């Protein structure tokens, strides 16, 4: 499943803030320096979607705040159920 994510780095804690249409807004504690926020985002999303870290792929947006993430390892219906819990 492909997910669009807008990252907010340097936050107090890692959390999914909201979902605006098909875009997730995610706060990450790591700074946007040398890919640290990207790594922490992938780690956080693997926990959030309950998949292995190796099943999360950053497909686009390595240097920007808007990212395209691919999540594998679970059925799309299961991932949609997780997404539906977000306000």
From Swiss-Prot:
Instruction: Determine the domain of life of the protein's source.
Output: Bacteria
Residues folding into a coiled coil are none
**InterPro entries recorded:** DUF167 (IPR003746), YggU-like_sf (IPR036591)
Gene3D superfamilies for this protein:
YggU-like (3.30.1200.10)
SMART domains per UniProt? DUF167
Record Pfam families:
DUF167 (PF02594)
Q: Its GO CC terms?
A: cytoplasm
UniProt lists the family membership as follows: Belongs to the UPF0235 family.
The record's section on HAMAP family has: UPF0235
User: What protein is this chain from?
Assistant: UPF0235 protein TGRD_618
Q: Which organism is it from?
A: Endomicrobium trichonymphae
> Which classification does the entry list for the species?
Bacteria, Pseudomonadati, Elusimicrobiota, Endomicrobiia, Endomicrobiales
